[in-house]
């Protein structure tokens, strides 16, 4: 017989009755019933009940066992007595009559239990993560993660993709977040960077003539942490040559749909992902990450509130300054108590808004009458128009967000989610996926009074490329000044030129599931002339391309194919499939909210010798 086990703790069944067995594992629970000891022995595969009678030679040692001791148990498999079966356990129809016990590893007193719901402080759980990982739920989450990654790999290879590995030590580049820097001992004063994504490498592989790339890629970003964001994460990195945006969608949809169907435990999955333009999702849902389980749709009622006979000046004054009014329907909210409306209003103030105006509708179809604080400022036909536009009927209510467009969208989007939650309107047991398309190529930075990229600077403009290049003709001074400040002053004086630039969209897309962004992607800008032009419109000259992205920029001068890609986040996919709200529940050894590894003590101090070897002196901030 094997030194440690003939079976796992999840193997034994009725058909094994009367057979000898050897098991090894952890003492999950130990119970004393009338002098008979019951040991629930646990390993990676399951739990088996072991019984030690007082007349067994193993009984004296069994009395000394404690929770989480690691033991080897020899015994005889037998059916459980009638009435003691546990049909909830795969091994619940048998038990092992113990004849011998060997202690393989004793355990000190546990700082936290390893079964049941965990309500211990997160820092304690992370400090003793090796114990936390013994809990069934967390253990299963980590196993789910592995199976999801296996499935993603198989699905990509099934579509003819080849798996690559790209460098971990690379050059620092401005990709939206701070880099993690690694000092070079061989090149004093110089630094490597950990990759925020293998972006340039995968595009270089396409330029090198490879066709279908994928990688389960580790990524590192020195950014502020939150529940769905981590300093290090993994993504299913994908790139393809000679493809259109629709080719990317046709490739990725079966992969994501298949994984959510395979591991979603019966949840319905969107059969075909709808394409929603960025401008539309910002209007209808107030966000570029819409949760489509929520049926509420925001509508614009700026025109209705702008009429001469509307006397609600609080909104009209904002409209005159370029603001908008967004209406968020609340079906059936008329039956809610006054406190429902007051709480929403208080919540809006807590979000930095002036509040949420509202109207409650009563009456018959076609003759609805508005009630509430601002209804008296709205003529009857305006009330009817708002009700019709928002799809309201008697007993429904509508809330209003009024501010400049970006702030109104944000408030209305948050209110939509809150109202949907309060009224329990959202669907459950579903994964609602969609594509967000036609992102703006550029945005206006009001604080710095300048145009900049809104998303990925290497995306192909979604417009007539000849006209895009022609923007340079006759307006070069406005577009490419001596420095960004000069160019921005010129743009500030040329509102028409600025408007034309800000109207340009890009072949950029996001895939969203239940309000979480799973991935961003794009058709890449593979032409150096268009790349120079795109950067020039944002105030960057060619030296920026050469200095920051020189490897890729030079490569594109030697025949680059049209290509595009995407990179769904593995961690967020697993988080959704596991029904968790925090990434730390699906990562084996995560850091805490402060970016600390409490188990191994990272980040840590290093010795003066190590710093000297790296030619580094510390300049610490004053405490």
From Swiss-Prot:
Subcellular localization(s) per the UniProt record: Cytoplasm
Alphabetical list of PROSITE patterns matching this protein: AA_TRNA_LIGASE_II (PS50862)
One GO process term, biological-process aspect: aspartyl-tRNA aminoacylation
Keywords: Aminoacyl-tRNA synthetase, ATP-binding, Cytoplasm, Ligase, Nucleotide-binding, Protein biosynthesis
Record-annotated site: Important for tRNA non-discrimination: 33, 83
GO molecular function: aspartate-tRNA ligase activity; aspartate-tRNA(Asn) ligase activity; ATP binding; nucleic acid binding
EC nos: 6.1.1.23
Residues holding ATP: 221-223, 517, 569-572
Region (Aspartate): 199-202
EC class (word): ligase
Main location: cytoplasm
Reactions listed under catalytic activity: tRNA(Asx) + L-aspartate + ATP = L-aspartyl-tRNA(Asx) + AMP + diphosphate
Transmembrane segments: none
Binding positions (L-aspartate): 175, 221, 455, 524
One of the Pfam families matching this protein, by short name: tRNA_anti-codon
Disulfide bonds: none
InterPro entries registered for this protein in UniProt: Aa-tRNA-synt_II, aa-tRNA-synth_II, aa-tRNA-synth_II/BPL/LPL, Asp-tRNA-ligase_1, Asp-tRNA-ligase_1_N, Asp/Asn-tRNA-synth_IIb, AspRS_core, GAD-like_sf
GO cellular component, one term: cytoplasm
Gene3D superfamilies: Bira Bifunctional Protein, Domain 2, GAD-like domain, Nucleic acid-binding proteins
Description of how the protein assembles with itself and partners: Homodimer.
Function of the molecule: Aspartyl-tRNA synthetase with relaxed tRNA specificity since it is able to aspartylate not only its cognate tRNA(Asp) but also tRNA(Asn). Reaction proceeds in two steps: L-aspartate is first activated by ATP to form Asp-AMP and then transferred to the acceptor end of tRNA(Asp/Asn).
Family to which this protein belongs: Belongs to the class-II aminoacyl-tRNA synthetase family. Type 1 subfamily.
Protein name according to UniProt: Aspartate--tRNA(Asp/Asn) ligase
Organism placement in taxonomy: Bacteria, Pseudomonadati, Pseudomonadota, Alphaproteobacteria, Hyphomicrobiales
